[in-house]
Amino acid sequence: MENDIMNIMNDIKYGYLDLNGNIHYVIDEDFDSKYKLQSPNETLNNKVGVCWDQVELERYLFDKKNIKFNTYFIVYYSDNICPTHTFLIYKIDNDYYWFEHSWEKYRGIRKYSSENSALNDIKEKFINDELSNNYDDTNLFIFKYSKPRYGINLLEFYHHCENGEKVK
């Protein structure tokens, strides 16, 4: 079942659709001002999305299959950049799984004994890969967030996620 979802996700490339309908395959200087969150159908049709868009498509697909899941936003607040990642963790029986498509290095499905152990592993990978272990733990947060409104911009997406439940 989850492999069917991954097969659908494998058609999606990393990048974003800007406000003018242009596709960008790299995060460029226009991202902050021109990004808009796509709906799952837009992501499917455009075959492009950053992690934020891809998780919304995953949300839609997991929901259709009635698989219990949560979505998370990890962010590191610093003066010049604020790296983020969104991801989905689902539960089947007593096991938890990290479903990852957009972060290519970790693409796949990983099994954990608890949701907390999954969150700790993802946090460690984010610190190692995105922050090069050079960070202040008081600036790193993970929020569990609900389905956002599609079409919102970057700051609106940040605010939506930050209004979720702070879990780490």
Where do the PLM segments sit?
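A structural boundary/capping signal
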Residues: 1-168
